[in-house]
Amino acid sequence: MKNFLFVLLIALSSFSCNQITEPENTETSMNDVINDALTEMENDTSVKSFSSPIRYNDYIINLQTRVYEKIITLVKCFDTCDDKELRASYADFGEEAIATLKEIKRLGDYSGNTDFRDKATDLFAFYVEVYEGAYKELIDIVISGKMDEKTEKKMNKIVEEVSEKETALDNAFQIAQQKFADENGMQIIENDLQKEIDNL
């Protein structure tokens, strides 16, 4: 059963999980910046803004990474968890997906650029949609234990539909991120999380 969700994970991962680097090294780590930002916003509903383009990018990518980490945990859970633990892992993913969507919706533009944020919002909304729809359906099927040719075809169809939609959203996100990087004289590098996904 794991391979069905793993295929879905691959569809979700693509290569959008990237960081942007400036030509010179920055002393502040991404995690420190994000943790500071998250602490500030815990009880804040104001628009979130950044004075640095790299911090702006890293904030978006960190939100995405948080969701991916929950997806990876869920995929691993398929091999090692009982039904109760699987449901709990699924719920954790959902909570993170919903939380990150709320957070990205609070993010302002960066020097007039709204496209990067907007494409990220579309992608994060998709994570919530997958949680409420495709993942729930797949997990319900697996927990039911009723696996036959008809069920397998149904699962394959779900995965194909998710993959098709995600590909379009992810491509749009990557284009927007690249444009943002170009506008701000920065380079995109692969996120370490992508390597972890590739090694699953």
Where are these regions (language model features)?
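Short, solvent-exposed, charged loop/turn and helix-capping segments
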Residues: 100-122, 139-142, 177, 184
